[in-house]
Design a protein with these regions (language model features):
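A short acidic/small-residue loop/turn micro-motif
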Residues: 68-72
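Ordered, soluble secondary-structure elements with a strong preference for glycine-centered loop motifs
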Residues: 8-9, 15, 74-90
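N-terminal intrinsically disordered, cationic/polar leader segments
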Residues: 45-63
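Residue-level signature of catalytic and energy-coupling elements of molecular machines
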Residues: 18, 59, 89
């Protein structure tokens, strides 16, 4: 009598489940790339004195916008004004990064550490 390996169906089901999880992870990654996250500084939500940084959920910056009053407030020949503008820009980027991290955790959190499976996924 030949041995038939009693758990062949279990392994096949496990591979199907792994493939399904991989597809879900890829979908979540694609959603992060398409998502728009806004980082603000200098006046809260999109005001005249606000710096806005546009990025996707994977922290790729797609644009930067300065409110209309920023140009009136900043003299690029004045070191203090340039430093203020740099600080506003960094604050907006960091705000966007924080929001992107939150979105990443929402999308990828259910997968735990599965991304570390290397070639298996």
């Amino acid at each position: 009598m030949a041995y038939r390996g009693g758990n062949g169906g279990g392994m096949q089901n496990m591979m199907k489940q792994a493939q399904k999880i991989q597809e879900q992870m890829q979908q979540a990654e694609a959603e992060l790339e398409e998502m728009e996250v806004l980082g603000f500084s200098g006046g809260g939500e999109e005001g005249d004195e606000t710096v806005v940084v546009y990025m996707n959920g994977k922290k790729v910056i797609n644009g930067i916008e300065f409110g209309s009053k920023i140009s009136e407030m900043v003299d690029l020949s004045d070191e203090d004004d340039v430093e203020m503008l740099e600080d506003l820009l960094m604050a907006a980027i960091n705000d966007g990064y924080k929001k992107a991290d939150e979105e990443y955790k929402k999308k990828m959190g259910p997968f735990g550490n599965l991304g570390g499976l290397g070639g298996l996924m």
